[in-house]
Amino acid sequence: PEAVKYKSWSHQERLCDLKEKVSLHKKGDIYYISQFTRSKTGTSFSEIKQSEELASFFAERACEFLHRFIVGGYEGWCIVTTPRRRHNEGFHFSTSICTKIAGAVKIPFYENAIQCLTKDRLNPEFFLLRPIKEKKIIVYDDILTTGSTLLATYELLKDREQLLFLVGINNK
């Protein structure tokens, strides 16, 4: 999709030009891969997170990446998304992306499998709502800001054979 060309009206509104820029990053003990990055012009994050069309676009790009990255097939893999905020109801961007990825590569998607015990965004504590039997897990986060969500998810799942952290937009 073509990015909307306008500058942010406020300092708070973040934008993405939707030009793919796959990058590897390190945060604490983990490495994560981002598909896109924040930009000075483009579509606002809030608009992106409300768009089913852009969820399909992000999922297609993620599948293309996964086909190149996961060698030997998807047997034993599943996908989860980082916990959704409790006050958000209705369309959920990450859930839509993960549903599309899971269908395309034929792996289980554990929707709402991880929940946050605290409201603290900088030091969240997560727990599993249900068991995840697969030992290889793709953890998807739509927009990374501080990285604390990925680190908390890592602490919860670090006993697994493989963890692949995939981020839609790196907001750093």
Give the location of each predicted region.
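A structural signal for isolated positions on well-ordered beta-strands in alpha/beta enzyme cores
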Residues: C78, I138, L164-L166
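Short, surface-exposed alpha-helical segments at coil->helix boundaries
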Residues: F91-T95, T99
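Short glycine-rich phosphate-binding loop at a beta-alpha junction
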Residues: Y74-R86
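Short helix-loop-beta junction
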Residues: T99-P108
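Acidic, metal-coordinating catalytic cores used for nucleic-acid/nucleotide bond scission
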Residues: P83-H92, T118-K119
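A phosphate-binding catalytic loop at a beta-strand-loop-alpha-helix junction
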Residues: V139-T153
